[in-house]
Amino acid sequence: AGIKKVHNYPLFKKKKLHLVNAANKFTCESLNINSCPTETKFFVKNEKINHAKKYFNKDNYNIVIGAGSSGPDTRWGERNFISLINKLNENGNYFFYIQCGPEQNEISKNIIDKIKKKNCMDLSKMNISEIIPILSLSDMYVGNDSFSHHITTQCNKPSIVLLLNSPKAYSDYSLNHHRIIPENAKLEELDHSSNYQANSISIEKVFKKIVELKS
């Protein structure tokens, strides 16, 4: 095929592999450069931005709620998000965009049905190209380790990531990540086998972090 040089990660070494550091090293070595910034700038076409603006009111503080994720052990849980949203609604003008995958739309539905103030929008039926402009226009991300926080951080939005049983490496690359971990947990020791329960991160702790970053 005329390919003169092929670069690849070492095989069978994912365990204990720091994904960000490994990618950084691989890129520097492959391109023969000294450093490779991990912060990027995510660009969205103006046409898509303008189309998404119809879902926004500038008088509100607009938060994307990342309620879905790839596995149930990494989810903070519907009850916690419901309590958090209701508490925020008692303390300010907010609007919430509930993000889950299409196969997890019951999570979005259950959350929205139990919010006293009807100020939520379900993103679960939208495709990625429709969701990204909304993420880029939001003021903040709050939620599980899911694809949305990777977009919001690179759109320079503060992103509160609730790390239950996800490695820290997944959110190590951006200053816009604000991680909340279970009580008595150590960030360096979190991984997919940690087995922390959703209630090990309190609603009050998340609420206070939102207020802190918002002010």
Predicted feature locations:
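Catalytic machinery of carbohydrate-active enzymes
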Residues: 1-215
